[in-house]
Amino acid sequence: MSNTRLTLFFTNIFQLLDSKIQNYSINFPIKILLLLLGFFIATVLATVFGQTGDWDVLVAGILVAMIEILGNKMYSKKYISKKQVFDISFLSLIGINYIKIGLIFGLFVDAFKLGS
């Protein structure tokens, strides 16, 4: 095939897509495991603390505070800079963020189970 502008364009597009897919597939099983861990923690919290009914408000307040603090740290300008992307503390913060997403999703699903 000759090197026309159209073939070069499609070659560059396919190379860009391939590099994006390879970047997203790094640590994919760990990310899924952390999401499921957060979902499991949400189920345990809803089951254990939901038995008495007295602890629901306190646990919900603590979870909301933890989620907001983590979101503040995750999206602050200190961690957004490019040179700290591969820092160990930033990678652990990303892992905790995946657990947080699983926790929120698990509580959301439990709320639907209780509502039906």
From Swiss-Prot:
Is the keyword Plastid in the record? yes
Q: What is its main location?
A: plastid
**Could you tell me the keywords of this UniProt record?**
Chloroplast, Plastid
Compartments in which it is found: Plastid, Chloroplast
Q: Name one GO cellular component term.
A: chloroplast
PANTHER family the record matches: PTHR33787, YCF20-LIKE PROTEIN (PTHR33787:SF4)
The UniProt family comment states: Belongs to the ycf20 family.
Q: What is this protein called?
A: Uncharacterized protein ycf20
What gene makes this protein? ycf20
